[in-house]
C-alpha cells in the first residue's frame, strides 16, 4: 500500500522507449504532435526541463484512490471497492460533455471533492495538461470517447 506515488523521474532518455503514440503513416516513428510535447522537442529538454516531483504530482490522486480502495477492502470486504469502482465507471461513461470546461459534479461527489475548490476549478485548462494543446479540442474528445 503506497501513500506516496512511485518515483518515475527520468534520469536518462532513449529514443526507442515510450512508443505509446505512434504515427499512423509510419508506425516505427513517434507522432510528435499527438504526444503534446510542443512539437519537435529535443531529447535534452525531456530530461532537463522536468522536476523530480512532477511525476509524483501527476500520480498523486491515482495513488490516493488506490490506497483508499485498499483500505475499504480491508475494512468492508471486496463489495465496497467494487461498488465504488462500478459507480465511477458509470459516471465516466455517461457524463460526457465535450463542451464543458469544468469537471463533472457526479465525479466530484464520488471522489468526495464536491466541497473543495482546486486551481483547475477556477482556471480551467491551466493545470499540468493545458487544454490549448494540439489534440485537445471538441472533435478529439468526441473521437476519444467514441473510440474512433
Swiss-Prot record:
Keywords: Chaperone. Residues 1-35 are annotated as: Disordered. Seems to be degraded by the proteasome upon its formation. One of its GO terms (cellular component) is cytoplasm. GO terms for biological process: DNA damage response; proteasome assembly; ubiquitin-dependent protein catabolic process. The keyword Chaperone applies. The keyword ATP-binding does not apply. InterPro entries: Ump1. Short-lived chaperone present in the precursor form of the 20S proteasome and absent in the mature complex. Required for the correct assembly and enzymatic activation of the proteasome. Also prevents premature processing of the PRE2 propeptide. Present with 2740 molecules/cell in log phase SD medium. Belongs to the POMP/UMP1 family. This is Proteasome maturation factor UMP1.
Amino acid at each position: 500500500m503506497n501513500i506516496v506515488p512511485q518515483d518515475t523521474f527520468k534520469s536518462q532518455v532513449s529514443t526507442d522507449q515510450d512508443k505509446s503514440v505512434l504515427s499512423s503513416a509510419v508506425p516505427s516513428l513517434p507522432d510528435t504532435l499527438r504526444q503534446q510535447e510542443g512539437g519537435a522537442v529535443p531529447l535534452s529538454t525531456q530530461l532537463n526541463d522536468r522536476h523530480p516531483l512532477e511525476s509524483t504530482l501527476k500520480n498523486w490522486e491515482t495513488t490516493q484512490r488506490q490506497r483508499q480502495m485498499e483500505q475499504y477492502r480491508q475494512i468492508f470486504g471486496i463489495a465496497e471497492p467494487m461498488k465504488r469502482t462500478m459507480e465511477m465507471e458509470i459516471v465516466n461513461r455517461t457524463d460526457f460533455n465535450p463542451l464543458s470546461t469544468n469537471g463533472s459534479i457526479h465525479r466530484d461527489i464520488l471522489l468526495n471533492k464536491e466541497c473543495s475548490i482546486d486551481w483547475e476549478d477556477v482556471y480551467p485548462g491551466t493545470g499540468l495538461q493545458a487544454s490549448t494543446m494540439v489534440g485537445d479540442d471538441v472533435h478529439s474528445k468526441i473521437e476519444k470517447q467514441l473510440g474512433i
